[in-house]
Structure formats: C-alpha cells, structure tokens
C-alpha cells in the first residue's frame, strides 16, 4: 500500500491538471499540452507489464471520458505503456526504482520523456486529424505540444520524485 498511494495521488493530480488547467489553455491551435502521460512515464521501473497496461488503460479511458474523445487518448496512452519497458531497457539497464533525472541521469531521463511524449502525441494528433490533408499542421502540433508537454512533465517529475525514497 505504501507504494501505491503516491501513484494514486499522481493519477488524480495529473487528471485534474489536464482537465482543469491544460485543456482550458487557448494560446494557439498548435499548443495542446497533454501532461497526463506523466503518470505512465513515472510508474516504477519494475512495474509488471499487466499493471503497466492496466494503468495506461485506466488513464486513457479516464481522459477520453473527461475530454469527450472517442478512444484517442486510450489508444495513445496504451501504446506508450506498451513501448515503455522496451524503451527503458534500451536507455537504462539497471532494475527497480522510479524513473527520474536523479536515477537515470538528466540526459537519459530527458530522452526518455521526449520519446514517450512524441510517440504519444504523434498517435494522438494523427488520430485526431484522421487526414493527410493537414500533415504539416499535424506535425507542427506534435512538435510544439510535445515540447511544452515535456517541460511540464519534467516539472511534475521533479515535484513528484522529490519526496519519494530512491527505491520506491
């Protein structure tokens, strides 16, 4: 229970941030930060694959319900949850702990976040557009929203992992 409580709170906080703050930002049509990916990105390194996929499914369905989307969030989040173990094996060889800048190193953690967020955003915005007609516009949305999302997820990760023991 001591391991799950921080992640339940992270789930709730990322959903609330996404729904009440980031979904209401109307700065540009190209800027749509999707920070709820932080939940899947910050799950412990030794999370069993079934739990990882179930967590991704729960987050995706919750965000689809909250945003009124028809499965786009679920598909993108499940893909991120599926790819995450292979990505971590590629970037980081040790077992256990929480993925954070202090454990993985700043550069590796930043690369990890960039790959996860760009993968999520590529699937999300491609499915949202459902057309090749606005390919350049979709690519710009992926890059701009991805960069802003990575910055906010970095901040969330710093706040979330600051209070956790190293091994959690």
Language model features with spans:
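Terminal, non-globular segments
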Residues: 1-168
């Amino acid at each position: 229970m001591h391991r799950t409580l921080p992640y339940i709170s992270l789930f709730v906080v990322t959903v609330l941030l996404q729904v009440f703050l980031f979904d209401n930002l109307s700065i540009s049509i190209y800027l749509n930060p999707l920070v709820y990916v932080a939940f899947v990105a910050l799950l412990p390194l030794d999370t069993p694959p079934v739990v990882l996929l179930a967590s991704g499914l729960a987050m995706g369905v919750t965000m689809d319900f909250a945003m009124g989307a028809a499965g786009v969030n679920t598909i993108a989040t499940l893909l991120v949850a599926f790819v995450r173990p292979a990505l971590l094996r590629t970037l980081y060889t040790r077992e256990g702990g929480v993925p954070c800048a202090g454990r993985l190193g700043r550069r590796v953690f930043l690369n990890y976040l960039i790959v996860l967020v760009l993968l999520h955003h590529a699937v999300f915005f491609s499915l949202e557009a459902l057309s090749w007609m606005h390919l350049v516009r979709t690519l710009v949305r992926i890059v701009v929203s991805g960069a802003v999302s990575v910055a906010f997820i970095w901040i969330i990760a710093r706040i979330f992992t600051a209070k956790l023991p190293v091994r959690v």
